[in-house]
A protein has these predicted regions:
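Hydrophobic mid-bilayer segments of alpha-helices in multi-pass membrane transport proteins
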Residues: 66-74, 89-98, 134, 153
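Structural signal for alpha-helical transmembrane segments and their membrane-water exit/capping regions
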Residues: 77-82, 98-112, 144, 223-227
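Alpha-helical transmembrane segments of multi-pass membrane proteins, especially transporters
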Residues: 10, 14, 25, 39-48, ...
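Helix-loop-helix hairpins and the membrane-proximal interhelical loops
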Residues: 1, 93-139, 157, 164-168
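Membrane-interfacial helix-loop connectors
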Residues: 14-17, 25-53, 57-66, 77-78, ...
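Interfacial helix-loop-helix linkers and transmembrane-helix boundary segments
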Residues: 1, 82-90, 197-207
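Mid-bilayer segments of alpha-helical transmembrane spans in multi-pass integral membrane proteins
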Residues: 53, 57, 62-66, 100-105, ...
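Transmembrane alpha-helical segments and their short flanking loops
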Residues: 103, 114-126, 169, 193-232
Length: 232
C-alpha cells in the first residue's frame, strides 16, 4: 500500500469514528500486534490528524436543524435493519447526531459565562498571552482526552459576544493558541497507549507527537501571519 492510501485510510477512519485519539490508539494496537508495519502506520496516523479537522469544520456550521432527523435516521437503521453492516451504520449516524446535540447544549450552557467578570478576565489574559493559550489548550485536552471536545468548547467560547455585545469574547487571535495547545495535548493519549506495547508502537506514537508538535510550534512562531492567513 502506498503512503497516500494510508493517509486516505486514516482520514476515512477518523471521519467515521469522530475521534482521532481512538483511531490513533487503534493503529498503535495494530502495530504492536504486528498487523501493520510502522511506515504504513505513520501514514495512517497522518491521515487521522487530517480527518479530525472535519469534526471542527462541521461544528462551525449551524447544523442544529438537522440533529433530530439524523438521530431518527440512526435509530431507524440500528433497530429496523436486519444486516449487521447497516446496524453499525445506524449506530454511527446516531452517535454523530448525539455529538452535535451535545455541542448545542454546551453552547447554551456557556452563554451566561460571557457576562462573568472572572471569565472575561481569563479570556483577556489568553488574548494577551499566546503561551498561556497554548498551555490552556494543552491542559484541557490532557484532562478531557479528546481534542474534538475541547475544540468544540473553544468554538462555543469564541462565539460568545463580549461586553460590547458585538466582538467575540476571545477573538481569533486568542483562539488559535488554545487550538494549537489542543493539537499538542491530544498526543498524550497515544503516548499513554504505547506503554508496554513494544518499540514499533512507541515509534508510531512518537511520530504522531512529532507531527502535531512540529506543526503547532511552526504555527505558534508564525502566529500573526497564520491568523491573517486564516482570516483571508
Amino acid at each position: 500500500a502506498t503512503p497516500l492510501l494510508g493517509v486516505l485510510t486514516g482520514l476515512a477512519v477518523t471521519a467515521v469514528l469522530q475521534s482521532s485519539s481512538a483511531a490513533t490508539v487503534m493503529v498503535i494496537g495494530f502495530v504492536s500486534a504486528g498487523l501493520l508495519e510502522l511506515p504504513r502506520a505513520v501514514a495512517v496516523i497522518y491521515g487521522i490528524n487530517i480527518g479530525t479537522t472535519m469534526t471542527a469544520q462541521l461544528i462551525a456550521f449551524d447544523v442544529q436543524t438537522l440533529v433530530y432527523p439524523v438521530l431518527f435516521l440512526g435509530f431507524l437503521l440500528d433497530f429496523a435493519a436486519r444486516r449487521p453492516r447497516w446496524q453499525a451504520v445506524g449506530e454511527a449516524v446516531f452517535s454523530f447526531g448525539l455529538l452535535f446535540e451535545g455541542i448545542d447544549i454546551l453552547g447554551r450552557a456557556l452563554h451566561p459565562l460571557a457576562g462573568q467578570t472572572v471569565f472575561l478576565d481569563w479570556m483577556t489574559r489568553v488574548k494577551e498571552s499566546p503561551l498561556l493559550g497554548i498551555l490552556l489548550g494543552l491542559s484541557m485536552t490532557m484532562v478531557v482526552q479528546s481534542s474534538s471536545a475541547t475544540i468544540a468548547l473553544l468554538q462555543n467560547v469564541a462565539r460568545q459576544a463580549g461586553p460590547d455585545g458585538i466582538h467575540s469574547v476571545l477573538g481569533l487571535a486568542g483562539a488559535v493558541p488554545v487550538l494549537l495547545g489542543d493539537n499538542i495535548g491530544t498526543t498524550v493519549t497515544a503516548l499513554l497507549a504505547c506503554i508496554g506495547q513494544g518499540k514499533n508502537a512507541a515509534r508510531a506514537a512518537l511520530a504522531h507527537s512529532c507531527f502535531n508538535l512540529s506543526g503547532s510550534l511552526l504555527a505558534a512562531v508564525l502566529l500573526p501571519w497564520f491568523v491573517r492567513l486564516v482570516e483571508f
